[in-house]
Every structure is written in structure tokens, then in C-alpha cells.
């Protein structure tokens, strides 16, 4: 059951009948435009439309805050898509002294570019993101699949392409002790927002010699990540893995990536008791994560629901101060960040937008 109601059984029945009628009506030659997975004019509404992407890119390349504001307004003016689009801010009765606000350098530490692997992007894009995040003091995540050890060494100009966060997924591709030792945080990925409860698959044609080398596998052979971690079937198992990872790199925080879902608060409480330092609540509206089309369209829950539940349950159980709450999944503007912060998030992942 959903905490925000929904269309209900009657609504589902109405939709099915409407589709059935469309399928069998006579003398109709017009096919639906579509645009479910890729933007098409007059098709389904997408938040990232071409003009808005171009506007954001222009704002970044020209360092223009005014252009960014036009982009943010363009996102805000779209049809209501997310739960946060239904919310608005109350004007405070009293302003906050700017001295009480964190400095820009401190604020940047709260941001990251999301978990995207070398295999999902490319070596160039993956390294560029890491360098950019390191330059501003934010964090990039390696994603699943390892990272070239050459990146652990700083470049001659002082830049670092080493991802501050290293991810461990169910298949453990690319995970070595050297990999774990060259990071500030280790992230255990339990699931992904775009396909909760499902595993992953990297098709054979994408497994180049470079990817195979990093993942310690064979070029051209499809790589499967199972839905569960086969050494985690309880909170006690998770606690053991967290303990082991902290022994491998005592200086690193250990985070657990969860997906927004009904009951995620209870899971978050267990994760906090397992001595995790960070809990990430991932929403459904970010990147596709190479998900099946049915999952992209029909699966997942907004981070607004998962984040608020996790924050409340952790607080009620006296565990909130033990962990840092992070969220990601379709964060596009400063407004999204502020709403996430008001719902309990302390750190924020911005993946698609950073690309």
C-alpha cells in the first residue's frame, strides 16, 4: 500500500479498459507518438528536454547564474511530475544570520556525482567527473566494476582522478584491497533506484579488454550481478561486512546504498545498528542504470517517500545522530536540494545533471 494513496483499483481498471478500447477500435490509423523512454515532441513529458539541457550546459560553460536561473525556472514550469513539485516553501518569520550558514567550501563537501561505473560511461567521462569533483572538494563514486590503479596517483598538474567513494556491489567486480585502500568512503550497494530488487547485466559487447581487465573477467563475455549479495542475508551479515571493510581501510567511512521503498525506515534502522556511517536513500527518477524498459517505466518509489520515512524511523529509535543521510535520484535544481535537506538529507548525489 502507498502512503500517498494513488489512483486505486478503480483507476487501474479505467486505464486498462481505455487501452483495450484503443487496441480494438476500427478505422484508426494514428499510432501513439510514444516518447516514453526517449523524448519526442508532443509525446510523454520528460523533465530533461533538449532546450533545458542546452540551457544548463550554457550556464555552466559561461559561468552565468542568470542562465542557470532560467534553466531552474524551466524545470519548475514543467507539468507536475515529482512529489516535490506539489510542495512550496513557507516564508520564515525571521531570517538566519549568514554567519550561521556553512561556507561554500564546506557546502561542496555535501555533494557528489552519484554512482556511475567506468563501464556505464567511458574512461574519459568517468575520469573527468572524478577530477571535477576533487577540484571543488565534492565526491565522485567509482560505481560498480573497479577503477584503474593508475588513477590512485595524482597527476603532474596536481589533479586527482581517483574517486573518493569506492562501491562494492553484489558481484564484487574489480574489488581488491588496493581499491579499498584508496578512498575516503566505501559504499555497499544493496540496490539501485531505477531497478530495486533486480541485479545488473553488462552485455558482452560492452565488455572490452579494458573493462575485463578492471573487472578481472573475460572480454566479450556478459557479466551478471546477482540481485542479492550472497553473503548478506541478514543485518548481522551486513554488520560483518561493514566490520571487515573497516578493517581493510580504518580511515574510510562505510555507507550503504538503499532504495526508497515501503518499509525502508526499518531497514535503515538495522543498517545504523550494523555500524554504517552513511545511509543513501536512492529514488526512482534518476538514471536508468541499464535497467529493463519495464523497470524504467513502472518500478521504484520517489526519494521523498523513502527519505522522510528513514529520517523519522531513525529519529524515533534514537539512531539518527549515528549516521549521515544522503539521497539521490533526479535532483536537478537548488530547489530540489533544499527540499531534500528539509526532509532530512545531509548529503546529495547529482548524477545525470553532472553529466
PLM feature spans:
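Amphipathic, alpha-helical segments enriched in basic
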Residues: 61, 96, 101-104, 108, ...
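Glycine-rich phosphate/ribose-binding loops and adjacent secondary-structure elements
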Residues: 1-22, 150-151, 229-355
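Conserved alpha/beta-domain cores
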Residues: 120, 131, 142-144, 166-172, ...
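Conserved, well-structured core domains of diverse proteins
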Residues: 1-213
Amino acid at each position: 500500500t502507498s502512503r500517498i494513496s494513488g489512483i486505486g483499483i478503480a483507476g487501474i481498471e479505467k486505464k486498462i479498459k481505455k487501452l483495450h478500447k484503443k487496441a480494438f477500435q476500427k478505422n484508426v490509423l494514428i499510432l501513439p507518438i510514444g516518447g516514453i523512454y526517449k523524448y519526442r515532441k508532443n509525446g510523454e513529458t520528460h523533465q530533461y528536454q533538449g532546450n533545458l539541457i542546452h540551457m544548463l550546459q550554457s550556464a555552466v560553460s559561461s559561468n552565468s547564474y542568470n542562465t542557470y536561473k532560467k534553466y531552474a525556472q524551466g524545470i519548475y514550469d514543467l507539468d507536475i511530475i515529482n512529489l516535490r513539485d506539489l510542495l512550496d516553501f513557507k516564508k520564515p518569520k525571521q531570517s538566519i544570520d549568514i554567519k550561521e550558514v556553512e561556507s561554500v567550501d564546506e557546502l561542496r563537501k555535501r555533494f557528489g556525482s552519484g554512482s556511475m561505473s567506468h563501464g556505464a560511461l567511458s574512461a574519459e567521462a568517468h575520469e573527468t567527473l572524478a577530477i571535477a569533483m576533487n577540484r571543488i572538494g565534492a565526491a565522485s563514486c567509482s560505481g560498480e566494476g573497479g577503477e584503474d590503479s593508475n588513477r590512485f596517483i595524482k597527476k603532474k598538474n596536481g589533479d586527482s582522478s581517483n574517486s573518493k567513494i569506492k562501491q562494492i556491489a553484489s558481484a564484487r567486480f574489480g574489488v581488491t584491497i588496493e581499491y579499498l585502500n584508496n578512498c575516503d568512503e566505501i559504499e555497499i550497494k544493496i540496490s539501485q533506484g531505477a531497478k530495486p530488487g533486480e541485479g545488473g547485466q553488462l552485455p558482452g559487447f560492452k565488455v572490452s579488454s579494458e573493462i575485463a581487465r578492471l573487472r578481472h573477467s573475460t572480454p566479450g563475455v556478459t557479466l551478471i550481478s546477482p540481485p542479492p549479495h550472497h553473503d548478506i542475508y541478514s543485518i548481522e551479515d551486513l554488520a560483518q561486512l561493514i566490520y571487515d571493510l573497516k578493517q581493510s581501510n580504518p580511515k574510510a567511512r562505510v555507507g550503504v546504498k538503499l532504495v526508497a521503498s515501503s518499509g525502508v525506515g526499518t531497514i535503515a534502522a538495522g543498517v545504523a545498528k550494523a555500524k554504517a556511517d552513511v545511509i543513501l536513500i536512492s529514488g526512482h527518477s534518476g538514471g536508468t542504470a541499464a535497467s529493463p524498459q519495464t523497470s524504467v517505466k513502472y518500478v521504484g518509489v520517489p526519494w521523498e517517500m523513502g527519505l522522510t520515512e528513514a529520517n523519522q524511523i531513525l529519529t524515533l529509535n534514537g539512531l539518527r545522530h549515528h549516521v549521515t543521510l544522503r539521497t539521490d535520484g533526479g535532483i536537478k535544481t537548488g530547489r530540489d536540494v533544499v527540499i531534500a535537506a528539509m526532509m532530512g538529507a545531509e548529503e546529495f548525489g547529482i548524477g545525470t545533471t553532472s553529466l
